[in-house]
Amino acid sequence: MITIERLEELHVALVQSIQLADEQVKFAGTAAEFLLDGSETTHLHVIKSDNEVVGFFKLDIAYAEHYEFSPEGSIGLRAFVLDKNQQGKGLGTGTVKALFPYLKANYSAHESIYLTVNYKNPAAFNCYKKGGFEDTIEQYLGGAAG
C-alpha cells in the first residue's frame, strides 16, 4: 500500500539512504538537496510503500508565483523521486494516483496541480500521464536539465 506523509525528523535518515541513478540526479536533485529545500512554501513529503520510505517529493504552494503557466490557486509538484531499487514496480504511478486524494484532503485551498517534466526523462513523463496528469503540450524551457 502506498502512503504519502509530510516529512518528519524520523524520516530524515531514511530519505538520506534513497539512491538515484546518476542520470536521474539532473532531473530531481539529490536527497541532500531535497532535505535543504523545505520552507513555509515548499513542503517536503515522503512516499511509503508498505510503511517503508521509498521516495520523496516537494509540494510548492507558491508555484504560481514563479511559473507563468501555473494559474493562481495551483500547487506545484517538484523533485519527485523513487529509490532506484524501487523503480519499475508501479510505485511511481501508484503514488501519482494517490497524490490527488491526498491533495484534496490536505491542500484543498489549491484548485489544481502543475509540474514540469523534461522530455529527456520519458519514464517520468509516462508515469505522470498514467497517474492522471494531463499533458498541456506547452514547453517550459527554463529547467536546469535543459
Model-derived features: where do they sit?
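Extreme N-terminal starter segment of soluble prokaryotic enzymes
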Residues: 1-3
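Acetyl-CoA-dependent GNAT
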Residues: 6-79, 83-85, 102-106
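Alpha-helix N-capping/helix-start residues
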Residues: 9-12, 93, 119-122
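C-terminal "cap" of GNAT-fold acetyltransferases
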Residues: 74-75, 109-125, 129-146
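Conserved acetyl-CoA-binding loop-helix of GNAT-fold acetyltransferases
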Residues: 82, 88-102, 126, 130
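Short coil/turn segments at alpha/beta junctions that flank glycine-rich nucleotide-binding fingerprints
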Residues: 89, 106-110
